[in-house]
Amino acid sequence: MSDRLLRGLWVLCLIFCITPAVAEALEVSATAAVLMDADMGQVLYEKNGDRQMLIASTTKIMTALVVLEHAAPDDVITVTPNHMAEGSSMYLRAGETVRVEELLYGLLLCSGNDAALALTECAGGLTPFVALMNEKASALGMAHTSFANPNGLDADGHYSTARDMAVLAAAAVENPTFRRICSSRSVTCSPSARVGARRCAS
């Protein structure tokens, strides 16, 4: 899993091991933070928990969750020039075909912005995919969240809060495929006619 995304999940998933007594004594330097008992939904600690902020690559937690609910691992996506993106990448090439599961590894291990865009084809393209992200956020009760893209690049109308992201993390780790991918250190993706074997590593 990418270092940035992993750090984000570790912060969010401290909810599983911090007791209320410890939470009371916490001091954090982050602008905003929430610790939550994932089983009970009880907030143990918060600092600016409802402040709307940029969420960068932690966006990809929602991207993965939406894909896992709307596509099969063996579904195949054809990469197009529209899937190329700035920033972190799994180095996709236009014209190659990639399985959804391999794109999920590229999304969560490499923090691939290109993988995020390619995965929007699971919903028929960027606009309907982002709509699904916002529908899922609403279903989870993420009342102070709005998604504008699947990779977390800064954009108008793209924000969340520490509280909402704690809710999202708790939902994501309930998915066994999400847990399996995020627990991997590396994976080698199958070669295609256009690209040789590709290794994704955290």
Feature-to-residue mapping (PLM):
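Bacterial N-terminal signal peptides that target proteins for export
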Residues: 1-9
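Bacterial N-terminal signal peptides
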Residues: 8-17
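A short, well-structured edge-of-sheet supersecondary motif
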Residues: 24-46
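Penicillin-recognizing serine hydrolase domain
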Residues: 26-30, 125-202
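Active-site SXXK
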Residues: 40-41, 54-77, 165
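Short, well-structured active-site flanking segments
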Residues: 69-82, 176-184
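Acidic helix-start/capping segments at beta-turn-to-alpha-helix junctions
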Residues: 78-89, 155, 188-191
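Conserved catalytic neighborhood of penicillin-recognizing serine enzymes
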Residues: 86-121, 198-202
